Curated annotation (Swiss-Prot):
Compositionally biased tracts (Polar residues): 1-10, 431-440
Domain notes: Contains FG repeats mediating the translocation through the NPC by interacting with transport factors.
Phosphoserine modification, residue list: 114, 434
Residue span(s) of domain RanBD1: 291-410
Gene: NUP50A
Source organism: Arabidopsis thaliana
In-chain residues carrying the UniProt-annotated modification N-acetylglycine: 2
Protein name (database record): Nuclear pore complex protein NUP50A
Amino acid sequence: MGDSENVQQPSKKRGALKQLSRDNPGLDDDDDSAELESGTFKKASDEVLASRRIVRVKRKEPSAAPVAASNPFAGIQLVPTTAPASTPVGTNAPLAESKLAPAEAVVEDNQKASDIEEGDEVDSKKVDVKDAVGEETEKTKDKDDNHCGKSADVQVAATEVAQMVSCDTNVCNNAVEGTDQTDFPLEKDSGGDQAEKKEKEGNGIEEADKNGDNGAFSSFQQHSSNKNAFTGLASTEASGSSFSFGLVSQDGSTGTGSLFGFGLPSSNSSSIFGATGSSIIKKSEGSGFPPKQEVSTETGEENEKVAFSADSIMFEYLDGGWKERGKGELKVNVSSNDGKARLVMRAKGNYRLILNASLYPEMKLANMDKKGITFACVNSVSEGKEGLSTFALKFKDPTIVEEFRVAIDKHKDSKPMEKAAEKSALPLKTPENSPTATDT
């Protein structure tokens, strides 16, 4: 028990005696605060207050209805008016005068320390408020003045641009009219010449309306006599062939030619490629691809009848193992001329010949895994090999294997025996029945 009493408790970390904060950043503020609390504030005397001037600033209350923002593009006119502008170009709107009176300084007297401190605090606050309000009003006035100046500048620039555009259009129209008549520089025309030009333009528009051409093509058609919409400004009928989107005929109907091509001139002048239009047409008519000639392919099976046909896979026994040779259609063909039979197999897809073997009487067939059958034959397709080779065929169904066996057994002995018998039945050629010299 004594040991437990002697055990000391773990000591706590020593904490600060006073908590520092923003209101109490230092440790020596207690003395100052005590002094401030003990003292009392004194009001300045009436004479001092009378000598001071207290200024009270009140802000203007904004109106309930907001003023609509002025449109800076309201004065822009794309089409220039005939009457000159009433206001001169260089004048700007006068600046609005300020309504608030300038800030006035507060007069202070060097008197008692308590009165000076109290007056300084009150006056500094009032002056700061007044200066802030004055700066805000000046900024708003500057913004309004800049806005008015910018709108006036925009209007002036718009009128100048419109006048320049109208002048440019007039100059372009005069230049276009001059290209059809003369190649000399433009000169000022008299009143009579202008009247004649207007009459000519009116006659041209009436003729275009009679021919059925709308106004959209008139601006392009006045530059050339052949009414080609997309040719040069000074193109004529005597010029060479050029690229166009089709020619408009005089009667208003389009031609039968291609809309997108090289237009051929009406005269016999030389074209771009050094040949006339008629020769080009003749060459295009004569240049045609010859018809494809059908090539007859002979497989050698034209004079044969198919006795058996089925799909199978062929294997060849080489070096102690079976190697696949291909997949395709196996046929037993019998010649219609001499009655001989042979095995023919072609690969599927490219019809490559992979088996061509004649049947012989000693040919033996052996079953292999129900769906397969083996035999020995001489394959004429395999080059460089002489003698018999062992092949195996695998079919899809065992019944096909039996059909193949029956077909082989039936035609492997098919030698020209019947024809030999027919030949033997013919009468022998003897001196009696032999042809004479007179017969030949």
